[in-house]
């Protein structure tokens, strides 16, 4: 099985590398991954697994947290 969310996960890794691991600058890509993962579980069910997505219960928690405001770590200089 190919991982449908691998491009989003790889984009996060590239962004983190490019920005010196400043997670706050990659927030839009993290959101994109979580959207992809939500679609993945909606289409394939909660028992589906992929290495690029958190398990459904953790994904729900992450989405709830992100809905409350910015949570990404900012790099301390």
Curated annotation (Swiss-Prot):
Its main location: mitochondrion. It is found in: Mitochondrion intermembrane space. It holds the Pfam family CMC4. A motif (Cx9C motif 1) lies at residues 5-15. A motif (Cx9C motif 2) lies at residues 26-36. SUPFAM superfamilies: Cysteine alpha-hairpin motif (SSF47072). The keyword Signal does not apply. The keyword Transmembrane helix does not apply. Residues 2-44 form the CHCH domain. Disulfide bonds join 5-36, 15-26. Signal peptide: none annotated. PANTHER family: CX9C MOTIF-CONTAINING PROTEIN 4. The twin Cx9C motifs are involved in the recognition by the mitochondrial disulfide relay system. Belongs to the CMC4 family. This is Cx9C motif-containing protein 4, mitochondrial.
């Amino acid at each position: 099985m190919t991982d449908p969310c691998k491009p989003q996960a790889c984009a996060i890794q590239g962004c983190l590398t490019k920005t010196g691991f400043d997670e706050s600058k990659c927030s839009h890509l993290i959101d994109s991954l979580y959207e992809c993962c939500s679609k993945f579980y909606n289409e394939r069910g909660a028992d589906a697994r992929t290495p690029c997505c958190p398990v459904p219960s953790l994904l729900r928690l992450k989405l709830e947290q992100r809905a409350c405001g910015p949570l990404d770590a900012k790099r301390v200089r």
